[in-house]
Amino acid sequence: MHHRTDTEESAVFKPLAVAVGLGCAVLSLGANAYQYGEYAGETLERLITDYPGRYRGTASFAGASELMQSRLGFGYQTSRQDFTWAGNRSSQNVIASAPGSSGKFLVLGAHYDTYYGRPTLQGLDDNASGAAVLTEIARNLGGIALENGLEVVGFGAEEEGLRGSRAYVESLDASQRANLLGMINLDSLVTGDKMYAHASSNSVSNPALGAYREQILRIARELDIPLFTNPGLNAEYPAGTGCCSDGESFNGMDIPVLFIEATNWELGDLDGYEQTDNPAIPGGSTWHDPAEDNKEVLTNALGQERIEQRMRDFSRLLTRLVLELTNADLLASTASGGALARQMEDQLQRQHQALTRLHDRRWLTLLGSNRPVGSFDGEVGAEGEVSPDSGFDMPGDPESRRAGVHLLGDYRYSEALTLGGSLAFQRSRDKLDHGGRIEGDTWQLGLFGLYNDGGPEWLAGELNLGHTRYDSKRSVYLQAAGGPVLLDQRLSGDTSAWSWGARLEGGYDFSFGELRSGPLAGLDYMRYRIDDFREDEALRTALGYEKQDYDSLEASLGWRLRGELALGARMRLQPYASLRWVRELADGRLEDMDLTSRGDGRVRVADMGGVDKDFGRAQLGAQLAITEQLGVFAEANSRFAHSEGNQASYSLGVNWQF
């Protein structure tokens, strides 16, 4: 904690060294998993135990600098910034940088030095606590995609007049100043009775600069963490504002500055300098006092839980705030929303494939029948299908389940031509990561025909129309590498979809006794449209989805095997199998789409991945006619040699002929 001074002196920026911190990733994350507050607790323990008396010119400060650079290294480029003042006084800042895609950046800072000239001062509260939480926030966000960059700075020489933060600000060029979004300062987080967040004094004339304060107070309410702001009981310190630490160096930049501290603004002179009314802390403060600002005294006075609680709660609050200020949460939400939209498209295509397989089975039945011209036959049936999340040649899509019922009938128009229609209802459910899901209720209407005069050639076709009502829930989930869950939100929405198209397929069957086998070729055109919609929750990560409109035109070439075997008790078995190569000639699906974030109203593009337009499909199944009316079937289908997995499915069904 810095006490006010009027001295202003120049600082010189001398870069010392640059190191890439991603090397820390080689450590076993599983073996070093941590929860909120634990990484900060480790940093704090090292600073106070190994490096008391952390002020310029000492081996202790040099060792603390090495420690801070190491602790800030995961996922960041780290460097040292040397600076001097008053001619012969020097210190340094430790800087860890993670760029964002926007070119703009946020500064998160805390000083790690202790009061000058007191070699036994542990400085647990002032300011090993702030420096420790600083390292944990950086660690939590290490490796996470950021839209706005993050610069984490451990300041030196704060206790000698904010020297490190002033040197940092003076080193910024015009471009950096233009792209600096704001600054968050952490100082003295343990001794004080209450946790506080204040805006800088520049927010008095420009209330918009108090935005970070209001944002973290809202987060505190969401997380149920007691957090306060200066009540304004002392006229020299307007309500909601703070002072007297490195954040002051950023006051003149017309950006939001947030002061994070623990004290008690309702004691003493009502200026925040009296931290506590705990009788075990004589005078109500521990700043700069080697006899009080140490682990033994603070643990005895406040309990070990106080230190752990402050490390944990400040980490939770500030990690969430920095996630939001860097828009890391919105980038993660956009990626999650793109995955949801991609899965909706996939489910819509699988619903169409279920109808085509229904018609395929009917055509197999018709090819094996000898019905008189003018006859009408019908069928009512039910089926269930499961698609596991693993399959034959590579991992599959998310687990999905489908149940359906259908009604169909066809008329034998001539010796060669049969015409029919179908009506089907399907209920589908796809499991998504972290408790998400997509549920679809689909009605499909089909018209189909088969041309076969009893010879080896056959030709079949269909027209179809479908409507789906979607209900969705997705997760926005972010977890630190080897650390705590940073964000876990559920967002729900609903929309409608339409599909329509036509299919033509033909082949030639060679006879091998009771078996028929031969080539087949097909062309399947579909138009898909999923209506635009907005998610229901009033969360900043909620999204608006544009309409998804795309075409699919699949050309297929393959080989089919079918047979008919008479069993006892008048039962008949129809086994069948096919193997096809498929070429997508149109869109197939969308590769990206626009999503609008509720948090800032901006449109971001979700990358849904390239479309694999060459792949295979395999099928193996059998229909069993138990009686003239009752039949069952079992079927396995798989997409294979596809960049997105095999998409295997297994179906069972029953039908009644009339």
Can you annotate each of these PLM segments?
Residues 43-99:
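A non-catalytic alpha/beta surface segment that caps or lines the substrate-entry region
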Residues 102, 371-374, 411-415, 451-455, ...:
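Outer-membrane beta-barrel strand-turn architecture
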Residues 392-400, 431-438, 469-494, 529-551, ...:
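Solvent-exposed, glycine/polar-rich loop segments of beta-barrel outer-membrane systems
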Residues 545-658:
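Outer membrane beta-barrel transmembrane domains
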